[in-house]
């Protein structure tokens, strides 16, 4: 039951407020309005006034009177200096709690005044000034709550003032941090672009506090700091950024080295995951290598334990999904730290072995989780995060958990197909319609992601092994990847796609080629009979000539050329290789194969030393195997496609190769290159009399003897 005394008190207050409102409505002069407003503010604070009363005050006053109060330069004798300004801001604070009034231009254009007000010194504890500062924050918060609020605050320069309010620990600095948190959550890149220096100083302060703090504020900072990290990974590039990372590491080490409650530990794991996503393990800047390696091992071990505890339960808790997703990022950091080659690795061999063991257990838990709930929860974003980490593990290690992985493959293929089909549907719609399509499902406006991309490196490994390869074929993976290949090709050179997405598409295309090459080598009969490979061959024939005209894609050119040449051996009798664009493909392939080696400025015995051309030398580590395989595959195609030898002559590849061998020092040509060129020259000599004549005219027999090309020498002798 309500307290009778409280009811009577409320009734008295309401009556008093009604009288004040009546006086306000009947006021004829500024002095009368001013006196009535003082009475109103004494009867009710802005946050205690209901919408109806607030509207009545606004109807009685409007914006004209508050504007005059804000810009008045004089106050009655004996009154506080900020009296009029304080009352004007109080009125606007009252109005700004109304969503309609908060977006009114007369409120929005006062943001600069609110910005200055929150940094007025209140050291003397002046109640009127403190109240004015609080009201200014109420105005900023009211504006922030509107749809355009963050943009309005940003465009009116609020961030430097909010940062200053926090740095100086002015009254209500907590509200400054609250508003900054909201702005950086909604508009992180724009905030950093507009106020980079101020946010740098703020992040430096927050990091220092996080490194030194011992109380509850440390855990609150762990929760806030991910929002204040710059959207682009610049911390490793600057001295101030590195100092921030040192302080963050110091604070995280203190937290994670102790036994804490879940609510205290989870924010620390999430902060570490944010740093891992941007910087891998490079963000760990401990005082020395020993501490750094221990800290890295500690984080990864903790993450693996959290993953196992959450996913090995018969009914995994959905409430833990956000922190487990963070732990996935930390485990992925551990995978990279254990597998990448470094001159000065952070982890020792024993540490790596220990971490590989716990990460394997965590991945086993993910497999168990996917087996239990995967088919039922395909719309759950957490499922994609789980598949991503499993893909990262399988990209490096397929020997462990092999049986479990093979059993899971049908689900993984189904999941990849589901995500891909949805991607195809949305890609064919106008962007506006596509967004509506996304909003109509449980993902909200977040695209579910590219499950195939996450699993492609694993598929490359698995397709090289017989048992999993048979499963992949039976589940229709080749046809799925052919469709995916087409989609990624479309993304690569689309005009309106983000650069990051195009880079990912290029990498996916390269990895797809690796999977297809495995199938071509291990399952030639299947490839020769499966219609999807005919479609793939058509796409390669169309795309390689186009790709050659674009700069900076030599690795992809190598993949397309070699894959197409390897497939041509198996599809030689298919009509696809007798279409008009087949010749254009082989011209492009010849261009790739023929521009790799050139004479250098260095000499040996008076002759230039053979070397790689500039563009090829930069990518040779990635493309050398593809180049040698491509030459071998091209040589095999010569006798299968009779028209190919004439194309070689028209391209001058044969003549240029013989000229190169004539001009360079034989000692500088390594045996692998000699073997590759001998195979090509021998096939051309056997298949075409015209090519044979050119070889003889260019001193082919002498070169064969000089370079130890016995097969070519014998061929020329037998066919003389």
Swiss-Prot record:
GO terms for cellular component: cytosol; dendrite; neuronal cell body; postsynapse. It comes from the Eukaryota. GO terms for biological process: neuron projection development; regulation of neuronal synaptic plasticity. Its main location: cytoplasm. Signal peptide: none annotated. PANTHER family: NEUROCHONDRIN. Belongs to the neurochondrin family. Probably involved in signal transduction, in the nervous system. Required for the spatial learning process. May also be involved in neurite outgrowth. This is Neurochondrin. The lineage of its organism: Eukaryota, Metazoa, Chordata, Craniata, Vertebrata.
